[in-house]
């Protein structure tokens, strides 16, 4: 059974409604995701001072950076069940307050175990945020509009690198003298963690759990969105119920999982080690490292938006994923093989960042 909809992506009324939704929701969600990603990967910049200050080895850092994802994986499903139970507004706000506190507490770390525990807890707290936001946006945007919105939302990743790199470098330099009895890396965790707590509090007031609660839309506009979403649901291919066991026996699930694993491996190799790689190219000043690290993220942000728009206009997804993935792999190969030539290595890292991050939406 299908429902014929007269609401096409190009109609003026629909564009007005969804533009209004976008202006209301996306700026706040964008800022939340920016700090989500910054709190997750700012250890890459903290590493420039933290390892020497605490006598941590590269192994300790690598394990601490990676143990985040154990907590992330373990709590992903429970967190999204809780989101459905308590509603996006309350659960997203609570998640942000919690991981903001854990991320800020990294400034108190003195031993590897403390580092591991806080990174693990941060991963647990962040687990439901991204999938929760994806689910949340699916309640506001029909499928035909969602590609561009997801690209806009996820452009917070390169923006976090674009702004976070120079900002982190400035913090490390500015507080290098130990103002307030804290080192630069400690100030960085404090300055970048506390805003997340504040954003979590704001989420309770700025987000709506569902379209029906959006009093800033007229009744006609709310009905328009509900009709578009219903049209999507009724035209979705009907599939029988599947158990967890039956899903895990599907080969394509494992193939998709492997593809996603490869994408994320490239993304986080860049996020966690880009500052150190740039330092090893001969740049020692933290602010200079921050500005250089911003270049790949600037290019990735532009490329991500262009690819997201192209995918929607052409209603094509496969090649809009394959090409960025190939770019990411090519860029990493270039960077690895020209590690002693700074200009070419940075070019390779830029291509890798453009491809890897654009593969995510």
Task: Describe each region flagged by the PLM.
Residues 43-44, 243-304, 360-361:
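Extracytoplasmic gate region of multi-pass secondary transporters
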Residues 55, 78, 87, 108-114, ...:
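Helix-breaking motifs and short loop linkers at transmembrane-helix boundaries and internal kinks
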Residues 74-113:
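Conserved MFS/SLC helix-loop-helix module at the cytosolic interface between two early adjacent transmembrane helices
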Residues 75-88, 302-316:
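Helix-to-loop junctions at the C-terminal end of transmembrane segments
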Residues 102, 114-128, 343-361:
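Hydrophobic core of transmembrane alpha-helices in multi-pass small-molecule transporters
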Residues 118-155:
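Cytoplasmic helix-loop-helix junction between adjacent transmembrane helices
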Residues 148-173, 195-196:
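Glycine-rich segments within core transmembrane alpha-helices of 12-TM secondary carriers
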